[in-house]
Amino acid sequence: MKEKNYGILNFNFIDNIIKKKRSEMLNILNKNIKDNDIESFLDIGTTEENELESSNYFVKNFDKIKIKNSISDQEIKKDNFNKFLRKSITSEFSETEILNYKSDLVISSATIEHVGSYENQIKMLENIIKLTNKYFFITTPNRFFPIDFHTKLPVIHMLPKKIHRKILRLINLNEYAEEENLNLLDENTVNKLINSQQNVSFEIRIFKVKLFGLTSNLLIYGEKIK
């Protein structure tokens, strides 16, 4: 889904903030993984938008990894990848697809809030675990941060979801009013997602990124238990 500038804040200002926060997320990831452990990288939810500095940020900043693959339901620029599978991460994956795309490091940046229902979000996490050899890293904005960086609007996304979606329809933001396009997560929901994964051989933790002293982003980090 391409981001549109509906809100009260300057678009370039927003992109600079997003880039800065993604740089902080990358630092958190680098502190937890062992670089010499990583031979292959899989990006989940690669976007067709690639011109903004914040777009596909992690792909652009893992230059040392030779094998880079992508799974996305968008038609993307494939130059950065060895292999590309056009498919939704909430779909069923065959054994062959898992074998072909399973990677040491799997990253999904700001995608899980766009896959639809809570059940779809669970399915996405399940598939990422299946596709991961060593580490996975999922980032998402925090629903209870006062500004929604999708619509660039303040506060209304913190209301109950039914009310939030009614308001979005009233102001003609119909695309974002559909659950299949935007279903924001908070820390409790992220914890529920993690707890839904029983008997997996991963240690899964939550990290938080802050902006103006408040949690702006939630990071799900998984590491294979040796």
Language-model features: where?
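Core SAM-dependent methyltransferase catalytic element
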Residues: E203-K226
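Low-complexity, intrinsically disordered Gly/Pro/Thr-rich segments
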Residues: I71-D73, Q198-V209
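Conserved class I S-adenosyl-L-methionine
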Residues: Y135-I163
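Class I SAM-dependent methyltransferase Rossmann-like catalytic core
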Residues: M1-N36
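Surface-exposed cleft-lining segments at the edges of enzyme active sites
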Residues: N10-N16, I89, A110-E119, Y176-N181
